[in-house]
From Swiss-Prot:
PROSITE patterns: SHMT. It comes from Archaeoglobus fulgidus (strain ATCC 49558 / DSM 4304 / JCM 9628 / NBRC 100126 / VC-16). Belongs to the SHMT family. InterPro entries: PyrdxlP-dep_Trfase (IPR015424), PyrdxlP-dep_Trfase_major (IPR015421), PyrdxlP-dep_Trfase_small (IPR015422), Ser_HO-MeTrfase (IPR001085), Ser_HO-MeTrfase-like (IPR049943), Ser_HO-MeTrfase_PLP_BS (IPR019798), SHMT-like_dom (IPR039429). This is Serine hydroxymethyltransferase.
Length: 438
């Protein structure tokens, strides 16, 4: 049996020796790691200095329960101004009839949407996790918390897309209340218009989780689900949308009251006012620079995919041009699987993640067939197609062990040191920097 009391005594003694400088030292180590690495995690990005200024403001100490003009706390007149700006910017950017900017994460936004659109016991249809779906769309996460029955779309792994004809057959039989589109692994536009038609035939809603492609939608480089028939669009604001880690919900005006009540008092109380202000600044940056940024993101992803393919890798989506987003997916089974390849690349200074692919079972989560690559962060620091080809060459050398780890790390560091300034922003500040505020 584990000695709980002994463990507590050990950690208590360690805690006595801790001080804030220990934390700062760890953060500095992490910052250096990111500065010297090539970050290709598809769900991360960098915020500008203007956005980060908001994080350390007094807003981070405050609460503002309720809606604009209808708060349960006093002292919120400036908060109301900020939230009003956030709502109007969101509506403008996404051409939305209604927007709620209070969700503090993508999963929270999805949970709110489930509360707004479904009842306990309803059936929903989503993309399975191996085919790219997010865990919050499934029984193990938000959908399960709402008490929903989850069925999965028939999926064409060669096209990396929902099979619409087969979906119609399943939908006529199962009668889902809600169709969810949008993915964690997403390479191409999804059939929103076609699913809208099916939904209308059986009286269902359509929801699109745009977390990964929100910035591409804002930059007009990807489909706008709201314009193609989605009732609700959720999305986290820190992936291709280069803002703080929080989320938005955009919807048809007829659903405004349902959405707002599902958010508060449903799943959000305080909504982190400092990052809300940061979102406003990021949205302004997106209006100013988003189109150029989004187009370059897609160009970079295509360039990386094409170079990896030319080096002999099994890049998914070949028949459709590999990708239309920030992501590239590669089948690396012949090189030991996603676990081995992700670790080898991390040792070389390239940071990405292993990923299930459509033919994998959930039992393969520990060592799936693939890796997922995202270029949105390296694009924000100014990298373009030439650098994508260089990254592919380094990846190839690491995976096939053509060079030593030290040689590879030096190549990564030499490439990265030319890119340490945030672009597509009002202030071109240092990208990887832990400020001393004393």
């Amino acid at each position: 049996m584990r000695d709980v009391h002994g463990s507590l005594k050990y950690f208590s003694s360690v805690a006595e020796d801790m001080n804030p400088s220990d934390v700062f030292q760890i953060i500095e180590g992490h910052t250096k790691l990111m500065r010297d690495s090539i970050p290709l995690i598809a769900s991360e990005n960098l915020t500008s200095l203007s956005v980060r200024r908001c994080y350390v403001s007094d807003l981070g100490h405050r609460y503002a329960e309720g809606r604009v003009g209808e708060r349960f706390y006093e002292g919120c007149k400036y908060v109301d101004q900020i939230e009003s700006m956030a709502i109007e910017l969101t509506r403008k950017i996404f051409e939305a009839e209604h927007a709620n900017v209070q969700p503090i994460s993508g999963v929270v936004a999805n949970l709110a949407a489930f509360f707004a659109l479904t009842n306990v016991g309803d059936t929903i249809m989503s993309i399975s996790v191996p085919c790219g779906g997010h865990i919050s769309h499934d029984r193990v996460s938000a959908a399960g918390l709402r008490g929903l029955r989850v069925i999965h779309y028939p999926f064409n792994s060669e096209e990396m897309s929902v099979d619409v004809d087969e979906t119609r057959k399943v939908a006529e039989r199962e009668r889902p209340k809600l169709f969810i589109l949008g993915s964690s692994l997403i390479l191409f536009r999804q059939p929103v218009k076609e699913i809208r038609e099916i939904a209308d035939e059986i009286g269902a809603y359509v929801m699109y989780d745009a977390s990964h492609v929100l910035g591409l939608i804002a930059g007009k480089a990807f489909q706008n689900p709201l314009k193609e028939g989605a009732d609700v669009m959720t999305g986290s604001t820190h992936k291709t949308f280069f803002g703080p880690q929080r989320a938005i919900i955009a919807s048809r005006k007829e659903l405004a009251e349902k959405v707002d009540r599902a958010v508060f008092p449903g799943v959000v109380s305080n909504h982190h006012l400092n990052t809300l202000a940061g979102y406003v600044v990021a949205a302004m940056e997106m209006l100013e620079f988003g189109e150029d940024y989004a187009k370059q993101v897609v160009r970079n992803a295509k360039a990386l995919a094409e170079e990896l393919y030319s080096l002999g890798y099994k890049v998914l989506g070949e028949k459709r041009g590999f990708t239309e987003t920030h992501q590239v997916a590669v089948d690396v089974r012949e090189f030991g699987g996603g676990e081995r390849v992700a670790k080898v690349l991390e040792n070389a200074g390239i940071i990405l993640n292993k990923n299930l692919l459509p033919w994998d079972s959930l039992e393969k989560t520990a060592n799936p067939s693939g890796i997922r690559i995202g270029v949105q962060e390296v694009t924000r620091i100014g990298m373009k197609e030439e650098e994508m080809r260089a990254i592919a060459e380094i990846m190839d050398a690491a995976i096939k062990e053509k060079k030593s780890v030290d040689e590879l790390r030096n190549e990564v560091k030499e490439l990265k040191e030319r890119f340490n300034v945030i672009k597509y922003s009002f202030d071109e500040s240092e990208a990887y920097h832990f400020p001393d505020l004393r």
